Curated annotation (Swiss-Prot):
Species whose genome carries this gene: Burkholderia multivorans (strain ATCC 17616 / 249)
EC identifiers of the protein: 3.1.-.-
InterPro entries associated with the record: RNaseH-like_sf (IPR012337), YqgF (IPR005227), YqgF/RNaseH-like_dom (IPR006641), YqgF/RNaseH-like_dom_sf (IPR037027)
GO biological process: rRNA 5'-end processing
Source organism superkingdom: Bacteria
Keyword Isomerase in record: no
Molecular function terms, GO-annotated: nuclease activity
The family this protein is said to belong to: Belongs to the YqgF nuclease family.
Role this protein plays: Could be a nuclease involved in processing of the 5'-end of pre-16S rRNA.
Primary subcellular site in the record, as a coarse category: cytoplasm
Identification of the protein by name: Putative pre-16S rRNA nuclease
Pfam families according to UniProt: RuvX
Database matches in HAMAP family: Nuclease_YqgF
Length: 149
Protein backbone atom coordinates (compact mmCIF):
# COMPACT_ATOMS: atom_id res chain seq x y z
CA UNK A 1 0.00 0.00 0.00
CA UNK A 2 2.13 2.83 -1.34
CA UNK A 3 4.83 2.56 1.32
CA UNK A 4 2.36 2.85 4.18
CA UNK A 5 1.91 0.00 6.62
CA UNK A 6 -1.44 -1.72 6.05
CA UNK A 7 -2.24 -1.11 9.71
CA UNK A 8 -1.84 2.64 9.19
CA UNK A 9 -3.72 2.77 5.88
CA UNK A 10 -5.83 5.78 4.97
CA UNK A 11 -9.13 4.77 3.39
CA UNK A 12 -11.80 6.64 1.45
CA UNK A 13 -15.30 5.18 1.39
CA UNK A 14 -18.15 5.89 -1.00
CA UNK A 15 -21.92 5.58 -0.68
CA UNK A 16 -22.86 5.58 -4.36
CA UNK A 17 -26.27 6.93 -5.36
CA UNK A 18 -27.88 8.04 -8.59
CA UNK A 19 -28.03 11.69 -7.45
CA UNK A 20 -25.31 11.93 -4.80
CA UNK A 21 -22.17 10.09 -3.69
CA UNK A 22 -21.33 10.29 -0.01
CA UNK A 23 -17.64 10.19 0.88
CA UNK A 24 -15.96 9.40 4.20
CA UNK A 25 -12.34 9.12 5.29
CA UNK A 26 -10.84 6.79 7.84
CA UNK A 27 -7.69 5.23 9.17
CA UNK A 28 -7.04 1.53 9.79
CA UNK A 29 -4.72 2.22 12.75
CA UNK A 30 -7.19 4.32 14.71
CA UNK A 31 -10.17 2.38 13.34
CA UNK A 32 -12.06 5.63 13.03
CA UNK A 33 -14.03 7.16 10.19
CA UNK A 34 -15.62 10.54 9.60
CA UNK A 35 -18.02 11.94 7.03
CA UNK A 36 -16.18 14.07 4.51
CA UNK A 37 -18.27 15.42 1.63
CA UNK A 38 -21.14 14.71 -0.75
CA UNK A 39 -20.40 14.75 -4.48
CA UNK A 40 -23.34 15.60 -6.76
CA UNK A 41 -23.57 12.70 -9.22
CA UNK A 42 -24.23 14.90 -12.25
CA UNK A 43 -22.38 12.88 -14.88
CA UNK A 44 -19.34 10.64 -15.29
CA UNK A 45 -16.91 13.52 -16.01
CA UNK A 46 -17.97 15.51 -12.93
CA UNK A 47 -18.04 12.41 -10.73
CA UNK A 48 -14.50 11.27 -11.53
CA UNK A 49 -13.03 14.79 -11.55
CA UNK A 50 -14.36 15.29 -8.00
CA UNK A 51 -13.12 11.86 -6.90
CA UNK A 52 -9.70 12.53 -8.45
CA UNK A 53 -9.43 15.79 -6.50
CA UNK A 54 -10.28 13.97 -3.25
CA UNK A 55 -7.71 11.27 -3.98
CA UNK A 56 -5.04 13.90 -4.67
CA UNK A 57 -5.87 15.71 -1.43
CA UNK A 58 -6.22 12.71 0.93
CA UNK A 59 -3.91 10.19 -0.80
CA UNK A 60 -5.74 7.06 0.39
CA UNK A 61 -4.13 3.63 0.24
CA UNK A 62 -7.39 1.85 -0.57
CA UNK A 63 -11.07 2.50 -1.27
CA UNK A 64 -14.28 1.07 0.17
CA UNK A 65 -17.58 1.14 -1.74
CA UNK A 66 -20.95 0.39 -0.17
CA UNK A 67 -22.85 -2.41 -1.88
CA UNK A 68 -26.64 -1.92 -1.72
CA UNK A 69 -28.58 -5.09 -0.94
CA UNK A 70 -32.16 -5.89 -0.01
CA UNK A 71 -32.72 -6.83 3.65
CA UNK A 72 -32.71 -10.53 2.68
CA UNK A 73 -29.27 -10.16 1.05
CA UNK A 74 -30.45 -10.30 -2.56
CA UNK A 75 -29.12 -7.73 -5.04
CA UNK A 76 -30.78 -4.32 -5.12
CA UNK A 77 -31.45 -2.17 -8.22
CA UNK A 78 -28.34 -0.16 -7.34
CA UNK A 79 -26.07 -3.16 -6.64
CA UNK A 80 -24.71 -3.40 -10.18
CA UNK A 81 -24.25 0.38 -10.45
CA UNK A 82 -22.24 0.44 -7.21
CA UNK A 83 -20.11 -2.48 -8.43
CA UNK A 84 -19.49 -0.69 -11.72
CA UNK A 85 -18.53 2.49 -9.86
CA UNK A 86 -16.04 0.56 -7.71
CA UNK A 87 -14.56 -1.16 -10.76
CA UNK A 88 -14.22 2.21 -12.49
CA UNK A 89 -12.46 3.65 -9.42
CA UNK A 90 -10.01 0.76 -9.49
CA UNK A 91 -9.43 1.06 -13.23
CA UNK A 92 -9.03 4.85 -13.30
CA UNK A 93 -7.01 5.34 -10.14
CA UNK A 94 -5.28 1.98 -9.62
CA UNK A 95 -6.30 1.69 -5.96
CA UNK A 96 -7.65 -1.50 -4.42
CA UNK A 97 -11.41 -1.46 -3.84
CA UNK A 98 -13.32 -3.42 -1.20
CA UNK A 99 -17.10 -3.67 -1.30
CA UNK A 100 -19.02 -3.60 1.99
CA UNK A 101 -22.65 -4.61 2.47
CA UNK A 102 -24.41 -1.32 3.14
CA UNK A 103 -27.78 -2.63 4.30
CA UNK A 104 -29.31 -0.13 6.73
CA UNK A 105 -26.35 2.30 6.48
CA UNK A 106 -28.63 5.22 5.57
CA UNK A 107 -31.03 4.34 8.39
CA UNK A 108 -28.14 4.17 10.86
CA UNK A 109 -26.69 7.41 9.48
CA UNK A 110 -29.98 9.25 9.85
CA UNK A 111 -30.49 7.94 13.39
CA UNK A 112 -26.97 9.04 14.37
CA UNK A 113 -27.50 12.51 12.95
CA UNK A 114 -30.84 12.79 14.73
CA UNK A 115 -29.14 11.76 18.00
CA UNK A 116 -26.58 14.54 17.52
CA UNK A 117 -29.40 17.00 16.81
CA UNK A 118 -28.30 17.60 13.22
CA UNK A 119 -31.46 18.99 11.65
CA UNK A 120 -33.00 20.29 8.48
CA UNK A 121 -30.81 21.20 5.54
CA UNK A 122 -27.58 20.23 7.34
CA UNK A 123 -28.88 16.69 7.84
CA UNK A 124 -30.11 16.42 4.25
CA UNK A 125 -26.84 17.80 2.87
CA UNK A 126 -24.60 15.40 4.80
CA UNK A 127 -26.74 12.24 5.00
CA UNK A 128 -24.90 10.47 2.16
CA UNK A 129 -21.48 11.32 3.61
CA UNK A 130 -22.65 10.07 6.99
CA UNK A 131 -23.84 6.84 5.32
CA UNK A 132 -20.34 6.49 3.80
CA UNK A 133 -18.93 6.94 7.33
CA UNK A 134 -21.17 4.14 8.60
CA UNK A 135 -20.03 1.88 5.74
CA UNK A 136 -16.38 2.64 6.43
CA UNK A 137 -16.79 2.20 10.17
CA UNK A 138 -18.36 -1.24 9.57
CA UNK A 139 -15.33 -2.16 7.46
CA UNK A 140 -12.87 -0.88 10.07
CA UNK A 141 -14.72 -2.66 12.88
CA UNK A 142 -14.40 -6.01 11.12
CA UNK A 143 -10.63 -5.75 10.62
CA UNK A 144 -8.74 -8.29 12.69
CA UNK A 145 -5.64 -7.28 14.61
CA UNK A 146 -3.98 -10.42 13.26
CA UNK A 147 -4.63 -10.13 9.54
CA UNK A 148 -3.02 -7.81 7.03
CA UNK A 149 -5.37 -5.02 5.98
Amino acid sequence: MSGTSARDATLLAFDYGEKRIGVAIGNALTRSARALVVIPNLNREHRFKAVGELLAEWRPDALVVGLPMHPDGTPHDMTQQAKRFGNQLNGRFGLPVTWVDERYSSVEAEAGMRERNVRGRARTDMLDAEAARVILQQYLDQLSDHEPH
